[in-house]
């Protein structure tokens, strides 16, 4: 009998919805809730600042969480792991602290058209302030990319290549390892948005060739408000801080400061130790389930849903008809029905999906669309969730007055 992973997630004991919006945020297992509550209940003090036992305990929990993240993504050292609020903050940190100090007029920054706004707007800012040129990797209508075209775009003028590992709209996995190798040949650094990859597959930043790798805790069953940035130690060492204030310094005078050692010079102010504890618990939970199990379950759910959605008249799915190209994400349109109406009608059926531009307006414009609906599955979803989703979708146009 297949284990019902929903029983690990308390929210499903309190609501009977088919939650299929996991690309926006995942639900949290009991062990994550326990880790956050335990920190506040038993260990709450300001980490890194006190010498009394509670503060030392809080510091230990925080730094142990950093070690957990370092092991999870294959960094060389915990010094290469900076805690942030989320992927957005991580990418902005790289843009401000690395981009603005290493990019100049005449240089090029290369991003893909598939990027979430969080991996586009920071690079627009860098190019605007430095006079560099922003260039784009395009994708085909099915979301695929041409490695030869990418290689031709990376030149001696290219200083930064930024690319998502998995698209939050298409669900497609991109060849960031190959692109990183091309970037490094030309002396550019590789920035990887891992927000949508870390929940679904093992990540090893060294094998990927990532110079920077950003991810969010809440996408991988951890708390909101905690995320991570991996950066190669030699790059982080030379970068100025992103924020200034308490705890990111060794000493301060009237006229200047000596910054703290890595990674603390990038973690100004009181840190989110409870969030870090919850993130570590989420990682341990994912490891206990195992990525083999996660990938198989998500593939089976996606295959079931995709085949049935493709058979519904007037429904159009973005990307390919192969479930392995979707990583749990099925983005679609329905003839004559606005995505917001799709989402509202499905919500009335107890099916929770996302509607809108998914913070990827340039990609949707490239595909000739303004908005879409998106269902995104996690390993804890069930065939019953798929049934409810497809049944709601199948009757949607009729309920809107279009007939069958």
Which residues fall in each region the model found?
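Pyridoxal 5′-phosphate
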Residues: 1-404
């Amino acid at each position: 009998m297949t284990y019902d992973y929903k029983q690990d997630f308390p929210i499903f004991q309190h609501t009977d919805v088919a939650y299929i919006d996991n690309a926006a945020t995942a639900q949290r297992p009991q062990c994550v809730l326990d880790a956050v509550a335990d920190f506040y209940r038993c260990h709450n003090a300001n980490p890194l600042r006190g010498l009394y036992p509670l503060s030392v305990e809080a510091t230990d929990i925080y730094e142990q969480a950093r070690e957990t993240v370092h092991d999870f993504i294959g960094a060389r050292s915990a010094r290469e792991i900076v805690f942030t609020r989320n992927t957005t903050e991580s990418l902005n940190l790289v843009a401000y602290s690395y981009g603005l100090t290493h990019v100049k007029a005449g240089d090029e920054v290369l991003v893909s058209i598939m990027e979430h706004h969080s991996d586009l707007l920071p690079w627009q800012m860098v190019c605007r302030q430095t006079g560099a040129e922003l260039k784009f990797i395009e994708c085909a209508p099915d979301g695929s990319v041409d490695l030869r075209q990418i290689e031709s775009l990376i030149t001696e003028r290219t200083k930064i290549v930024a690319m998502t590992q998995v698209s939050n709209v298409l669900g497609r996995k991109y060849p960031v390892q190959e692109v990183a190798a091309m970037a490094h040949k030309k002396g550019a650094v590789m920035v990887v948005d891992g927000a949508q990859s870390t929940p679904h597959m093992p990540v090893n930043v060294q094998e990927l060739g990532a110079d920077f790798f950003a991810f969010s805790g809440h996408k991988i069953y951890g708390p909101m408000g905690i995320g991570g940035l991996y950066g190669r130690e030699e790059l982080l060492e030379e970068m100025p801080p992103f924020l200034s204030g308490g705890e990111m310094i060794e000493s301060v005078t009237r006229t200047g400061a000596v910054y703290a050692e890595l990674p603390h010079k990038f973690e100004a102010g009181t840190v989110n130790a409870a969030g870090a504890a919850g993130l570590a618990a989420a990682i341990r939970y994912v490891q206990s389930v195992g990525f083999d199990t996660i990938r198989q379950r998500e593939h089976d759910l996606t295959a079931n849903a995709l085949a049935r959605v493709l058979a519904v008249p007037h429904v159009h799915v973005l990307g390919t008809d192969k479930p392995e190209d979707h990583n749990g994400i099925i983005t679609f349109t329905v003839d004559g029905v606005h995505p917001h109406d799709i989402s509202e009608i499905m919500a009335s059926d107890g099916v929770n999906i996302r509607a809108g531009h998914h913070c990827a307006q340039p990609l949707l414009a490239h595909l000739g669309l303004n908005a879409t609906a998106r269902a995104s599955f996690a390993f804890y979803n069930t065939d019953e969730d798929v049934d409810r989703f497809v049944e709601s979708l199948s009757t949607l146009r009729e309920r809107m007055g279009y007939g069958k």
